[in-house]
Amino acid sequence: MHDYQQKFIEFAIQRNVLRFGEFTLKSGRTSPYFFNAGLFNTGNDLLELSKAYAAAIARSGLDYDIIFGPAYKGIPLATVTAMALATDGNSKPFAFNRKEKKDHGEGGNIVGAPLQGKVLIVDDVITAGTAIRESIDIIRAAGAEPAGVLIALDRQEKGNGELSAIQEVEKEFGIPVVSIIRLEQVLDYLKSNPEFAGHAENVASYRDRYGV
């Protein structure tokens, strides 16, 4: 595990973004953990989050020209990631979409830089992949191509079939999905910290049952 990944896990736990217990998911499954990136809701939270996204991009080696944040959650994520990259001397344009088109002023449903070249999509998680598919449609309609997807957490969990939602996106569009952390790293962290020993066992059992 890299330093930025351990720091991100610790910070997510501290901010109650990553919690352990018993949670009923939309899928109906009972999960021993829950990740809610919406609780990164202060300026400092976004600062720390942006550093983790920038570190994940640097490690991934992804080749891209512009950052895109799907409305709504992806908008602040793309914005702060672009800022963190600029701090590291890697300034990239960014854009996001509106849910509704405007018929006055700045027209269209894209705000920010024009979508062109290779586009990196930044979001919090991929659950069903719907937002990512919509983003790819928007990107291609603008004449650009998706370069990959960057998310905070890869649950490494099967969907309805044998593949995870992330694997389905990778297979369908032929693009990589990069995450700051994966469930296996969360599990490693839990195992290495005695205070989380009980949670480690529950997460490991869940991963054995639903993992990919």
From Swiss-Prot:
<feature type="binding site" description="in other chain">
    <location>
        <begin position="123"/>
        <end position="131"/>
    </location>
    <ligand>
        <name>5-phospho-alpha-D-ribose 1-diphosphate</name>
    </ligand>
</feature>
<protein>
    <recommendedName>
        <fullName>Orotate phosphoribosyltransferase</fullName>
        <ecNumber>2.4.2.10</ecNumber>
    </recommendedName>
</protein>
<dbReference type="GO" id="GO:0000287">
    <property type="term" value="F:magnesium ion binding"/>
</dbReference>
<keyword id="KW-0460">Magnesium</keyword>
<dbReference type="GO" id="GO:0004588">
    <property type="term" value="F:orotate phosphoribosyltransferase activity"/>
</dbReference>
<feature type="binding site" description="in other chain">
    <location>
        <position position="99"/>
    </location>
    <ligand>
        <name>5-phospho-alpha-D-ribose 1-diphosphate</name>
    </ligand>
</feature>
<feature type="binding site">
    <location>
        <begin position="34"/>
        <end position="35"/>
    </location>
    <ligand>
        <name>orotate</name>
    </ligand>
</feature>
<dbReference type="GO" id="GO:0005737">
    <property type="term" value="C:cytoplasm"/>
</dbReference>
<dbReference type="GO" id="GO:0044205">
    <property type="term" value="P:'de novo' UMP biosynthetic process"/>
</dbReference>
<keyword id="KW-0665">Pyrimidine biosynthesis</keyword>
<feature type="binding site">
    <location>
        <position position="104"/>
    </location>
    <ligand>
        <name>5-phospho-alpha-D-ribose 1-diphosphate</name>
    </ligand>
</feature>
<feature type="binding site" description="in other chain">
    <location>
        <position position="26"/>
    </location>
    <ligand>
        <name>5-phospho-alpha-D-ribose 1-diphosphate</name>
    </ligand>
</feature>
<keyword id="KW-0808">Transferase</keyword>
<dbReference type="InterPro" id="IPR029057">
    <property type="entry name" value="PRTase-like"/>
</dbReference>
<dbReference type="InterPro" id="IPR004467">
    <property type="entry name" value="Or_phspho_trans_dom"/>
</dbReference>
<feature type="binding site">
    <location>
        <position position="98"/>
    </location>
    <ligand>
        <name>5-phospho-alpha-D-ribose 1-diphosphate</name>
    </ligand>
</feature>
<comment type="similarity">
    <text>Belongs to the purine/pyrimidine phosphoribosyltransferase family. PyrE subfamily.</text>
</comment>
<feature type="binding site" description="in other chain">
    <location>
        <begin position="72"/>
        <end position="73"/>
    </location>
    <ligand>
        <name>5-phospho-alpha-D-ribose 1-diphosphate</name>
    </ligand>
</feature>
<feature type="binding site">
    <location>
        <position position="127"/>
    </location>
    <ligand>
        <name>orotate</name>
    </ligand>
</feature>
<feature type="binding site">
    <location>
        <position position="102"/>
    </location>
    <ligand>
        <name>5-phospho-alpha-D-ribose 1-diphosphate</name>
    </ligand>
</feature>
<comment type="pathway">
    <text>Pyrimidine metabolism; UMP biosynthesis via de novo pathway; UMP from orotate: step 1/2.</text>
</comment>
<dbReference type="GO" id="GO:0046132">
    <property type="term" value="P:pyrimidine ribonucleoside biosynthetic process"/>
</dbReference>
<dbReference type="Pfam" id="PF00156">
    <property type="entry name" value="Pribosyltran"/>
</dbReference>
<feature type="binding site">
    <location>
        <position position="155"/>
    </location>
    <ligand>
        <name>orotate</name>
    </ligand>
</feature>
<dbReference type="InterPro" id="IPR000836">
    <property type="entry name" value="PRibTrfase_dom"/>
</dbReference>
<comment type="function">
    <text>Catalyzes the transfer of a ribosyl phosphate group from 5-phosphoribose 1-diphosphate to orotate, leading to the formation of orotidine monophosphate (OMP).</text>
</comment>
<keyword id="KW-0328">Glycosyltransferase</keyword>
<comment type="subunit">
    <text>Homodimer.</text>
</comment>
<dbReference type="InterPro" id="IPR023031">
    <property type="entry name" value="OPRT"/>
</dbReference>
<dbReference type="GO" id="GO:0006207">
    <property type="term" value="P:'de novo' pyrimidine nucleobase biosynthetic process"/>
</dbReference>
